[in-house]
Every structure is written in structure tokens, then in C-alpha cells.
Design a protein with these regions (language model features):
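Membrane-embedded transmembrane alpha-helical bundles that form the catalytic cores
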Residues: 3-158
Length: 158
């Protein structure tokens, strides 16, 4: 359904729900944002190609270098045996986990957005620096924007 009307062909629906860049880890792409792009001739400019490649590489770096490294070499060790570490080290483990989870989620989103851009589809940025927020409310608005929007629309969270 798009604009309260069924899509013209079932293959359009299948394409929308199975579009692989966003299928596994998001971002959650709404039909109102995706369907109009489906019917346009997908063109990728040199600038968009560069932007897409940059997003893929940044996302890959966040996920594999930062998130996975912090997880394996720092956070998991502290969380597996917290009594072996001091209070400060445990606190650093919590901060490390916050960085790890951000880099994991935003890394996947950046890669998906970059791949979609290489295919001629533009998705919105999903994690615009949430840890630079001044309030919890602002943090929630910046953290996984597509999920927050979906929850707001379908679970009526305001």
C-alpha cells in the first residue's frame, strides 16, 4: 500500500519489502519514501557514487574496526568478569559499550544507505551524532531515527 492505494503490481511490493540494502539492519525505509524512487529512472551521478562509496567505507570502518575491536578486546572482557576490574574500569566498559553499540548500528545503517545510493536510491541518515545531544529527548530523536519514527507512527509514542 502506498498513499492508501495498493501498488499496481505485486512485483513492486516484493521489490520494496526485499530491497536488500535495508533488509537486514535498517534503516527502516517507509513506502512513502521508497516507492516514488522506484518509479524514477535510477541514475547515479559521480558525486552520488563518491558519497555512496564513502558511506560504505565509513560504515565498514565503524562496524569492523571500532565496534568489533572494542567488543572483543575491551567490553566483553569487562562484562564477562566485572569483579576482576575496578569501578573506573567497569565505568569505562559501560562507555565502551555505548560506543560499540553506536558504531555497530550506525555502521550497518551507513553501509545500507551507501549501497542504496549506488543503486540510485536515497535514504535518510539514521544516526546524526546522537552522543552530541544536550538532552535525553534530543538523543532519542537522533538515535535510530527510522525506528523512532516507526514506533511513533505505529505505537503512538510521542
Amino acid at each position: 500500500m502506498y498513499k492508501r492505494q495498493p501498488l499496481g503490481r505485486w512485483i513492486d511490493y516484493v521489490f520494496y519489502v526485499s530491497f536488500f540494502p535495508q533488509l537486514v539492519a535498517g534503516p527502516i525505509v517507509r513506502a512513502r519514501d521508497f516507492i516514488p524512487q522506484m518509479y524514477k529512472n535510477p541514475t547515479v551521478t559521480r558525486s552520488e557514487f563518491g558519497e555512496g562509496l564513502f558511506l560504505i567505507l565509513c560504515g565498514l570502518f565503524k562496524k569492523t574496526v571500532i565496534s568489533d575491536y572494542i567488543s572483543m578486546n575491551f567490553v566483553d572482557r569487562i562484562f564477562d568478569a566485572p569483579l576482576l576490574y575496578t569501578g573506573v574500569e567497569n565505568l569505562l566498559g559501560v562507555y565502551g559499550y555505548a560506543l560499540q553499540i553506536y558504531c555497530d548500528f550506525s555502521g550497518y545503517s551507513d553501509m545500507a544507505i551507501g549501497i542504496a545510493l549506488l543503486l540510485g536510491f536515497r535514504f535518510n541518515i539514521n544516526f546524526p551524532s546522537p552522543y552530541q545531544s544536550a538532552t535525553i529527548t534530543e538523543f532519542w530523536r537522533r538515535w535510530h531515527i527510522s525506528l523512532s519514527s516507526w514506533l511513533k507512527d505505529y505505537l503512538y509514542i510521542s
